[in-house]
């Protein structure tokens, strides 16, 4: 696989996702980091996004709820280069009916090399990093070259 670069702008497009048992933890984290987050564009799966808006007043572009296709919608945005980083508080102790969607979402975040926090400590590191407020170059798959190679 060949790679190219993509610039993540100073104003980030951030996906916020949380499993049911982790929603309160994400809400608490968003509340604590509201000042940093208000400078960025927020996206979320359905229930999580609506809870964030109701509890913090921050504008959130909400997808469908995760089990109804919201995880896949966020994954599509990642593949299109429209999400720059993801905060995903997932529940490692309880299976969810849409586990394959969750795995696919995390796989796409890895393929497209976006920063991902799956717990509060890592999320804190991301928002407190100097890179959180600056443009950042990341390596991403060169899809055009990938497609050309496959069509030979």
From Swiss-Prot:
PROSITE patterns: METHYLGLYOXAL_SYNTH, MGS. InterPro entries: Methylgl_synth, Methylglyoxal_synth_AS, MGS-like_dom, MGS-like_dom_sf. It catalyses: dihydroxyacetone phosphate = methylglyoxal + phosphate. GO terms for molecular function: methylglyoxal synthase activity. Residues 6-152 form the MGS-like domain. The keyword Lyase applies. CDD domains: MGS (cd01422). Disulfide bonds: none annotated. GO terms for cellular component: cytosol. Its EC number is 4.2.3.3. Catalyzes the formation of methylglyoxal from dihydroxyacetone phosphate. This is Methylglyoxal synthase. The lineage of its organism: Bacteria, Pseudomonadati, Pseudomonadota, Gammaproteobacteria, Enterobacterales. The gene is mgsA.
